[in-house]
Amino acid sequence: VFNPHPVDIKTNEQKGTFPSRRAAVAADNCSDMIFKNITFKTDCKGQAEGFLLNGERNYAENVHVIGDGDALQVNGSAYWLNCVVDGGGDTVLGRGPSYFNHCTLSSYGAFMWIRNTKENHGNIFNDCTFKGLGQDAVIARLPDNKGKNYPDAECVLLNCTLDGVPVEGFGPVAETASTANLLEFNSHDKEGMTIDISRRNKHVRQLDAIKDAETIGKYSNASWVLNW
């Protein structure tokens, strides 16, 4: 599904407008759609989406997305179940909100560059697996971007498996994004052993099963995250 737009509009600059010319598959301003049992793939390198999705209340199940930078870009609410995303870096990009349930992601660089505003949640991962394929495969990064950042960005990991992810987990996170909501609960390695969080990025907050039970419960609820 393709919706052309002015060439002077940059990615994520305005809601509903982004350059879909580089994506293998682009669903632009599409809502209430279901994507099941399908693979979206591009062989292009650089900023090359396998799948670019813009819209509200979209659902994906057993979808395999293969790209390079920005392999999966999502702008608008979407639920992902048993999906696989393979990318080169900033593998999941966009404004969200996205709820990932039992998904597997692999990346050579950072898994995410989160860009949601305070208007909605960001990227939430429940029982997902992250496979880092390179030394820079942090979960998410928030560097200054040409004088701009995303202070309301949100990334939450619940009961996730981390394999090949650097000990700092997240980063770099510039001070201009120090208010980002980066939460982690019960991350473990592929053997099920608790991850060493002693050297985690200072901007990441670890959730406690008892003290933060209410917060964990909310983020475990996809309807609450997506406002569906």
Model-assigned labels for residue ranges:
Residues 1-228:
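Sequence-level preference for short, compositionally simple segments enriched
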